[in-house]
From Swiss-Prot:
Annotated domain remarks: The large envelope protein is synthesized with the pre-S region at the cytosolic side of the endoplasmic reticulum and, hence will be within the virion after budding. Therefore the pre-S region is not N-glycosylated. Later a post-translational translocation of N-terminal pre-S and TM1 domains occur in about 50% of proteins at the virion surface. These molecules change their topology by an unknown mechanism, resulting in exposure of pre-S region at virion surface.
Gene Ontology BP terms: caveolin-mediated endocytosis of virus by host cell; fusion of virus membrane with host endosome membrane; virion attachment to host cell
Gene name of this polypeptide: S
Stated role: The large envelope protein exists in two topological conformations, one which is termed 'external' or Le-HBsAg and the other 'internal' or Li-HBsAg. In its external conformation the protein attaches the virus to cell receptors and thereby initiating infection. This interaction determines the species specificity and liver tropism. This attachment induces virion internalization predominantly through caveolin-mediated endocytosis. The large envelope protein also assures fusion between virion membrane and endosomal membrane. The middle envelope protein plays an important role in the budding of the virion. It is involved in the induction of budding in a nucleocapsid independent way. In this process the majority of envelope proteins bud to form subviral lipoprotein particles of 22 nm of diameter that do not contain a nucleocapsid.
Protein name in the entry: Large envelope protein
Amino acid sequence: MGNNIKVTFNPDKIAAWWPAVGTYYTTTYPQNQSVFQPGIYQTTSLINPKNQQELDSVLINRYKQIDWNTWQGFPVDQKLPLVSRDPPLKPHINQSAQTFEIKPGPIIVPGIRDIPRGLVPPQTPTNRDQGRKPTPPTPPLRDTHPHLTMKNQTFRLQGFVDGLRDLTTTERYHNAYGDPFTTLSPVVPTVSTILSPPSTTGDPALSPEMSPSSLLGLLAGLQVVYFLWTKILTIAQNLDWWWTSLSFPGGIPECTGQNSQFQTCKHLPTSCPPTCNGFRWMYLRRFIIYLLVLLLCLIFLLVLLDWKGLIPVCPLQPTTETTVNCRQCTLSVQDTYTPPYCCCLKPTAGNCTCWPIPSSWALGNYLWEWALARFSWLNLLVPLLQWLGGISLIAWFLLIWMIWFWGPALLSILPPFIPIFVLFFLIWVYI
């Protein structure tokens, strides 16, 4: 009989009432509308069941043979009946028996209970059996706290859902009476197994771009910038004091603010208020000082880039030369030198004279060669520069510190010895 239930009964007797597969009325005219409820079933055939208990015992025995956690013993091709609100066809009066066949339908998940899946316990007789007006069906209660019972049912739900995943199909099924024009969608009640964390109010939400570490780094950077800015202002003020002192060898006098529209109190020329006539000159000196400091920073940056070899400048007098085709001038020549290469500006017969750019101090060599070409006396400083270049970095820092600390005191002592130092230098160079 395939995957369907066939229950044969005498139309003069109430044969069976089973919510899992449907409600059957065997009278000539049913007083109550039949309601076919969903359920999981196996092929079952009963001829004229005597009472409800007989049908219950047969179906319960069938359902007990199935392990609903692993779905062992349940045929893979078993389907569920569709929900139909239509009553059975009205039987003929002279008909001795009638067979209802429920065809397969989409899977509908049964309720989560502590009984085998698909088996719904028989209901007690209601007022419908006594001829009263049927009461409307009560909608199922909504589970407002699914997380309270989720822990005990997670394992059982997992096996049940795995079985449903194997049985679910997307084909179009007929309804309980074989009507091909009605297709009912399955209703699958699910319980979420993922609990969302409790949301807190009042806490500021930090974006991924503004993490605590980046916020601390920003604050530290602002402090460093503020510290450097105060130091720059201090350096500018000290340089302004030194520049002003050049005009007053005997000492910087106080600015009384006379000859101005607004009388001001006495102050120094390096801190004139906006109402003083010396205010514009003070800021002009500060502006020139800032430009000089910026120029020093640029010179330091150029020296650093030239030392790293990031300023490719061709030397004026190359030490090594290579003559190759002009098309290959920027390529390596027998892997002797590393690119890039420099070419002459006037090629002869399609050939270029190429020489490599120094890997370090290219700009310095170019400027030095340019100065030697115009000032020949600079060759006398070559030994001194070579000697200074051989001094270690620690010796340089020590020399700078000694000049900074003892320089002002030595200015009054060294002038008598300067001619002797010049004589010793000339002897050391030419002898």
